[in-house]
Regions:
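Accessory, often C-terminal, charged low-complexity segments
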Residues: 1-168
Length: 168
């Protein structure tokens, strides 16, 4: 049934484009398809007697290996109550992909060891919310510095920054 529905939507989009009087405009008839899946995170909740010192490296990254940037982005959007139908753009800076949802509603980057230029580009968008993956930062002090930069540049107090900046 989902495949039939997707094909009908594609055909309807083509028909609308063919019959549209707006031939000079790029008419967007695209759509997103979602499926229900398990969460993006590994279960790392264990009792102290269930693991040993050699296993600690297994818990460095709590995100499941098969998850994509978009999985993380849409998961965060759901958690924040942000509509999944909002427009989204991507921009590449220093080899890192930056996602912007609804203009400046949510700005995210999941690349490893992001550069100062990436952070500056994200902050310049004056986002309402910011999302990073923990592996974006090579050290905790880098994470703290970026947190403080967003607070300063966006004129957020501590509480606003904690609410609006997430690291997954």
């Amino acid at each position: 049934i989902p495949e039939i529905a997707k094909e009908r939507i594609r055909r309807a989009g083509r028909k609308i484009k063919e019959e549209s009087q707006l031939t000079t405009q790029d008419l967007d008839t695209g759509f997103r398809v979602f499926r229900i899946d398990s969460g993006n995170y590994k279960n790392v909740t264990m009792q102290p007697n269930e693991y040993d010192q050699q296993m600690l490296d297994l818990f460095v990254d709590n995100i499941k290996a098969d998850r994509t940037d978009l999985d993380l982005l849409f998961g965060a959007m759901l958690a924040w109550g942000v509509q999944l139908s909002l427009p989204m753009t991507t921009e590449e800076v220093d080899g890192c992909k930056i996602y912007a949802v609804d203009g400046n509603g949510l700005v995210a980057c999941f690349a490893e060891n992001i550069s100062e230029n990436v952070v500056q580009t994200m902050a310049a968008k004056q986002p309402l919310r910011v999302l990073f993956r923990d592996s974006c930062f090579d050290e905790d002090k880098t994470k703290i510095n970026i947190f403080e930069r967003f607070k300063q540049q966006l004129d957020w107090d501590e509480k606003e920054a904690i609410q609006n900046i997430r690291v997954v």
